[in-house]
Swiss-Prot record:
GO BP terms: positive regulation of RNA polymerase II transcription preinitiation complex assembly
Record GO terms (molecular function): double-stranded DNA binding; single-stranded DNA binding; transcription coactivator activity
Keyword list, A-Z: Activator, DNA-binding, Nucleus, Phosphoprotein, Transcription, Transcription regulation
Protein name as it appears in the record: Putative RNA polymerase II transcriptional coactivator
Residues bearing the modification Phosphoserine: S96, S98
Protein family according to the UniProt entry: Belongs to the transcriptional coactivator PC4 family.
Length: 136
């Protein structure tokens, strides 16, 4: 009977997968929506820390992680954070800390004015240099 499992009388073969450990209460998590079904969770597995972005479901009063989601190691998380600004720009989103349209226009006008002043100064300096070379 090689390769077959022998079941003693009274024993039942279990077709269920072994239960996984419930999410511990000390893991940090942040809800992405009002129902808390989408979360960012920090965890550690085999000595490696992960940031999970995952959908959860409720079963028997407990919120359990679902299949939909992704686990990022620390390097992947850092890269995602670097890309967020580019994604925001592509979506046309404005950061709340950024300047308003009026402030941007004012800065552009000031920069243009400074550029004109700089050009005028350079022109005057060139004219003085030309005048001094004529005198010699």
């Amino acid at each position: 009977m090689a390769g077959k499992r022998v079941i003693a009388s009274g024993d039942k073969a279990s077709s269920k997968k072994p239960k996984t450990e419930k999410q511990s209460d000390h893991e940090l998590h942040w809800a992405l929506n009002e129902t808390e079904k989408k979360r960012i969770t920090l965890s550690e597995f085999r000595g490696t820390r992960y940031v999970h972005i995952r959908e959860y479901y409720e079963k028997d009063g407990d919120m359990l992680p679902g299949k939909k989601g992704i686990a990022l190691n620390i390097n992947e998380w850092k890269k995602l954070k670097q890309l967020i600004h580019e994604v925001d720009d592509s979506l046309g989103l404005v950061d709340s800390g950024s300047d308003s349209e009026d402030e941007i226009k004012e800065k552009a006008e000031n920069n243009a004015s400074l550029k004109n002043d700089e050009d005028d100064l350079n022109t005057k300096t060139e004219n003085k240099t030309d005048d001094s070379s004529v005198e010699n």
